Design a protein with these regions (language model features):
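A solvent-exposed, charged loop/short amphipathic helix patch at secondary-structure junctions
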Residues: 45-74
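Short, hinge-like loop/turn segments at secondary-structure boundaries
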Residues: 20-23, 48-51, 151-153
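Short beta-strand/loop segments at the ligand-binding rim of alpha/beta enzyme cores
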Residues: 1-8, 93-99
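Substrate-binding cleft/loops of secretory-pathway carbohydrate-active enzymes
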Residues: 2-42
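Substrate-binding cleft of secreted/luminal carbohydrate-active enzymes
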Residues: 26-45, 70-158
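Helix N-terminus capping/helix-initiation residues
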Residues: 19, 59-62, 113, 142
Length: 158
């Protein structure tokens, strides 16, 4: 039997008690959930905003300022590409690592664009990871998104 573990992005993992090294030693591979284009659970922006809400429960008016602060200190206040690369680089050597890339998002949310999928695939490969896992309801992803993820379709289409 093979055992794999979904882990939050490296910046979130310590905050939820996930130790990449310890968990990686128990699994055949780990899958960092590096979802930067979808606003769904485990998505980078979704989780960061949830943290801001959690620390603002006693003072809801402070939510917007805390959200902006968390985005600034994590580097997620602009282009997520650089942040994504930093998170890939922050993954400690733990055996087999297979990053998760979202191909689809939840119903009612904007789709993940093929150019974004291609960009994520490119950045994962540039970081030295040549395996990847297609995430977020792959059965609902369109064929072109799957082809882009697999490296079959061009990177310049949407």
């Amino acid at each position: 039997m093979k055992v794999a573990m979904d882990l939050f992005a490296p910046f979130l993992a310590p905050l939820v008690g996930q130790d990449y090294r310890r968990l990686g030693a128990m699994a055949d591979f780990i899958k960092p959930m590096l979802y930067r284009h979808t606003y769904t659970p485990a998505g980078l922006f979704f989780e960061l905003d949830a943290m801001a809400r959690a620390v603002s429960e006693a003072a809801p008016a402070a939510y917007a300022a805390r959200r902006a602060y968390l985005r600034q200190v994590t580097g997620m206040d602009g282009d997520t590409g650089g942040f994504f690369e930093r998170e890939l680089a922050a993954i400690p050597p733990v055996g087999r690592v297979v990053p998760g890339i979202e191909l689809h998002t939840a119903e009612g949310l904007p789709p993940v664009r093929r150019t974004d999928i291609a960009d994520s695939v490119h950045r994962v490969e540039q970081a030295g990871y040549f395996d990847r896992v297609a995430c977020w309801d792959i059965l609902s992803a369109d064929q072109k998104a799957i082809e882009t993820f697999a490296g079959i379709a061009g990177r310049d289409q949407d």
